[in-house]
Amino acid sequence: MAPILDDSIALEKKQEIQKKFGGVFQGLWFEEEICFAIAGGGCKAFYGLGFGHEMKSWGLKFREVSGVSAGAAMVLCLICGDEEECVSFFENIVRKNPANFYLSRLFKGERVFPHEEMYRKTIRFGMDFQKIVKSGIKVFIHTLKAIPKEDSLRNKFRLARLIAETAKAFLEDERDKKRGLNTGRMQRVLRKWNMKEVLFTEKDFDDEKAVEQIILNSSSVPPVVSVQSHGNEYYFDGGLTNNLLLEVFPPDKKTIGVYYEPTTIVGKDPKLLERCYLQTPSEPLPITSFDYTDPNGVRRAYELGKRDARLNKDKIFEYLKKDWAKAAFFLKSK
């Protein structure tokens, strides 16, 4: 006599077969290996982490990734596969942090901003060096390296003044971009710094400390995150010149990018933007870049990223259709 199968067992087997068949079918019609970029933005980058996490659950694989500032930490977190744990860890340390600025520390000679220490702790918690190396995924992290031309800038007071001037120029340029005006302040300041763009890749990941330092190099936003320096070289947030690194990916590969502000893509090549799928939050993000006191905002930004990915799943898969599949659909519809 044939064994009697419980209905639930039969249903599970059917679903398993459908899932396997669906995976094969998906691989035939869609590009499953993609390039993925997350813009910098401090806590806002948790939105990008949530978006990437949701796409991974569909079976999409990252062939190449790029990140700037906090976006760099997020793309590496996606490679390590511990997104949920990292969000929970950061929520917990943020919950214990009552303020973004501690004046009392100033008189003790300590850092008045808690951000850098909390940032480093989260990076150390979430980074699995062996997973990153063994993944085979190409990684690009954008930063700025400066070697001041003027010897006088070795004076700490003058160096601090130039740092303040850099921050002011960036904020004023962002304001003008929102108004649709041409900007040039940052370029003038960068010339004083003798600044050039630097791309770190997975080939620069010698060990865990190197990975951590590269992320910090890309995230240097004084005074919140101190200027990272090595000898006479200074590193600044890569977002000062390019906060969404799309240009490094092969033009024939499907590329998805996440950013948060309209000014991020101002000045980018229109042809580059046309061949990418770009995503911004569907509603105002519930947290600001440097608010390290709001665990609920962190979680909500992450969950909004996941939700927006789900809401746009059909659009994303339409973008990921292979060229022959699009052609077949076009011929069928004629």
Residue ranges of each PLM-predicted region?
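Patatin-like phospholipase
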Residues: 1-65, 77-334
